[in-house]
Curated annotation (Swiss-Prot):
Keywords: Disulfide bond, Secreted, Signal, Toxin
Organism for this UniProt entry: Naja atra
Identification of the protein by name: Neurotoxin-like protein NTL2
Subcellular location: Secreted
Entry-linked Pfam families: Toxin_cobra-type (PF21947)
Length: 86
């Protein structure tokens, strides 16, 4: 009985997320995705991509403490959910 109780306590500690951490995509394609664990205080995911370019545009994804500002000819999408920056 003690062994079962100890096992349950260990499993609970391992599985319990004591602090919430945002998960953002740092790379994404239809074939794969790379997830970034954001540091404390970085509660937003973002995606930057060029305006008006239709072929093979570059895309920058990551975590941010605040939403990045849009630049000339660059769109910025910002969101506050896990892996929302597809």
């Amino acid at each position: 009985m003690k062994t079962l109780l100890l096992s349950l306590v260990v499993v609970t500690i391992v599985c319990l997320d004591l602090g919430y951490t945002r998960l953002c995509l740092s790379d994404y394609s239809i074939f794969s995705e790379t997830i970034e664990i954001c540091p404390d205080g970085h509660n937003f995911c973002f995606k930057k991509f060029p305006k008006g370019i239709t072929r093979l545009p570059w895309v920058i994804r990551g975590c941010a403490a605040t939403c990045p500002k849009a630049e000339a000819r660059v769109y910025v999408d910002c969101c506050a959910r896990d892996k929302c920056n597809r």
